[in-house]
């Protein structure tokens, strides 16, 4: 393998797609919360819940569709708990979100042993996984990337511009942004901030669950303890540094997925694992700092 193929090849592009899809779904859910003025640190738990729910339901039913539906429902259930506690009961969202992350990690580990009688990883050869409609295409360069797209990947591609259109060009979207910018002013105009924030958290729950389903049933068909592996915290950091700007969010996630894909391949030529593991975070941080500075110069930063 040449040095160029390690950093730029169809295989790298396919790996980027596989890594980017769950990040995008989870990131869009987090963005909805952020624009509604909700600091959602439970994204890690939402994704992990989706991972387990998808595999458990797929194993029980033999259907990936049922697995995806269960993942979305499980994510929505965790988000409902967060919304009920932080919005209805006025609990600290940071404390409650962190507690939910810990609870989900412990619960999925317990259920893995209780339901499947295994520790660490559950994997079965006949476990239904998501279809890949473009598998087998012979297109040069982009062929492997298209083959890596599942239906949830196509959903992620469509969801990003759809969310932009909703937030910028619809009345409910503008009201949601108004709630995030100044809830008191929004309430004076007859908008109910709690209702929009509750809905934003539920949307994040569904998208987080779908992100987990993509992670566990997309390119693989398995569940392992703590499968989300910090991706939710990566999204939280990216959202904080991107200032709620969708282009900056997507660019940062793309850089993260690319650096992660290249890092894995560079391990095969002797790059220390610690360096390859750190590369996605360092690259993403550099991009966010650069875009943040540019935005401030242009007066676009919030």
Where are these regions (language model features)?
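Loop-to-transmembrane alpha-helix initiation sites
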Residues: 94-95, 121-125, 148-154, 197, ...
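Helix-loop-helix "hairpin" substructures at the membrane interface of multi-pass membrane proteins
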Residues: 144-223, 246-251
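Inter-helical junctions in multi-pass inner-membrane proteins, predominant
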Residues: 8-13, 167, 204-237, 270-274, ...
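Hydrophobic core segments of alpha-helical transmembrane domains in multi-pass membrane transport
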Residues: 26-27, 51-55, 105-109, 153-164, ...
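Short loop segments and helix-boundary regions at transmembrane helix junctions
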Residues: 33-39, 78-134, 169-171, 227-247, ...
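Cytosolic-side transmembrane-helix boundaries in multi-pass membrane proteins
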Residues: 162-163, 181-195, 263-302
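Transmembrane helix-bundle core of multi-pass membrane transporters
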Residues: 105-169, 271-276, 302
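Single transmembrane alpha-helix segments in multi-pass membrane proteins
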Residues: 11-61, 66-68, 72-98, 240-245
């Amino acid at each position: 393998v040449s040095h160029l193929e390690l950093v730029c090849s169809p295989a790298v592009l396919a790996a980027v797609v596989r890594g980017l899809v769950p990040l995008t779904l989870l990131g869009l859910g987090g963005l909805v919360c952020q624009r509604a003025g909700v600091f959602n640190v439970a994204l890690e738990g939402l994704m992990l819940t989706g991972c387990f729910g998808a595999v458990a339901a797929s194993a029980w039913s033999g259907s990936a569709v049922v697995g995806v539906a269960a993942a979305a429902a499980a994510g929505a259930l965790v988000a409902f708990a967060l919304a009920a506690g932080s919005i209805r009961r006025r609990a600290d969202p940071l404390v409650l979100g962190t507690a939910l992350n810990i609870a989900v990690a412990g619960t999925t580990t317990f259920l893995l042993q209780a339901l499947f009688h295994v520790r660490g990883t559950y994997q079965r050869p006949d476990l239904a996984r998501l279809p890949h409609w473009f598998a087998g295409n012979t297109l040069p360069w982009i062929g492997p990337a298209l083959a890596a797209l599942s239906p949830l990947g196509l959903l992620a591609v469509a969801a990003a511009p759809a969310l932009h259109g909703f937030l910028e060009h619809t009345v409910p979207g503008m009201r949601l942004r108004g709630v995030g910018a100044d809830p008191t002013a929004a309430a004076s105009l007859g908008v109910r901030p709690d209702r929009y924030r509750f809905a934003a958290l539920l949307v994040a729950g569904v998208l987080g669950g779908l992100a987990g389903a993509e992670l566990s049933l997309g390119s693989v068909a398995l569940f392992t303890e703590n499968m989300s592996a910090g991706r939710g915290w990566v999204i939280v950091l990216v959202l904080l540094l991107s200032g709620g700007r969708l282009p900056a969010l997507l660019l940062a996630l793309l850089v993260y997925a690319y650096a992660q894909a290249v890092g894995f391949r560079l391990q095969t030529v002797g790059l220390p694992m610690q360096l390859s593991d750190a590369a996605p975070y360092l690259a993403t941080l550099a991009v966010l700092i650069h875009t943040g500075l540019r935005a401030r110069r242009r007066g676009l930063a919030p």
